[in-house]
Amino acid sequence: MCRNITELRGLEPPATHEEIDAAAMQFVRKVSGITKPNAEVAALMHEAAHQIAHITADLLAQVPPRRQPPVTVPPLRRPEVRERMGLAPFPG
């Protein structure tokens, strides 16, 4: 649970809903300190992540563009991470 929160502003192509949702869930896990919730807590965490993702998407749509892209590639754009997670290749 020591991962850094992924920086999404300034990506080309822009951050996907999948990336925003993953970052929101990562944030919820980090601030709650819960990595393996029971069903009741999992539902609460998913609702919180959904709300955070919506707010984050609005924020990213409104902030001014960056002068330079982030220095690291977000995990969900790395082929080895997507393969490990069983996700399709990143479309870009």
Q: Which residues make up each language-model segment?
A:
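A charge-rich, low-complexity, intrinsically flexible signal that marks solvent-exposed coils, linkers
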Residues: 1-92
